[in-house]
Regions:
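Mid-chain, well-packed structural core segment of small domains
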Residues: 66-103
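Immediate N-terminus of the mature polypeptide
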Residues: 1-69, 100-143
């Protein structure tokens, strides 16, 4: 089973003087959020890592329904890239649990906030290879 350092609000979580870690579904949730919230091209070693979601939505004057469809497509692409990364981990004989691997992308929804149209609420649902549903959600500002 693999693990990652636990993050909260972008900071490492330390409890009792020890760095906390995440595994299984909690790790997959964190991996999904990191992949979707990292702007593609910002990691010089892995320029393909991340999504173009923020570049699409922030400051764009296209119709909201067009932005939503483009955003869904970009999130789907970045989640497929995450699946490929997970497959590479398994092929390299790294121990990766079934609950930290995406089996299928169940749903991606992007909803423009009715009160503040500069905000988009994003929800992602995936099925793990351990047959568990993982739901990730975050808010993106178009400003």
């Amino acid at each position: 089973m693999s693990f990652d350092l636990k993050l909260s609000g972008g900071d490492l979580v330390i409890q009792g003087g020890k760095l906390q870690t995440v595994t299984d579904g909690e790790k997959l949730l964190q991996d999904i959020l990191k992949m979707c919230l990292t702007t593609a091209g910002t990691n010089p070693v892995h320029p393909w890592y991340g999504s173009f979601l923020s570049r699409t939505i922030i400051g764009n004057s296209l119709n909201a329904s067009v932005l939503v469809q483009i955003g869904k497509s970009q999130l789907n692409t970045c989640l497929e890239n995450l699946k490929k990364l997970q497959d590479l981990q398994v092929k390299s004989l790294q121990k990766v649990s079934a609950d930290e691997q995406i089996s299928a992308i169940s749903d991606i929804s992007i909803i423009r906030n009715e009160i503040n149209p500069t905000l988009y609420d994003i929800r992602i649902s995936v099925l793990t290879k351990g047959f568990k549903t993982i739901n990730a959600s975050f808010r993106l500002s178009a400003l």
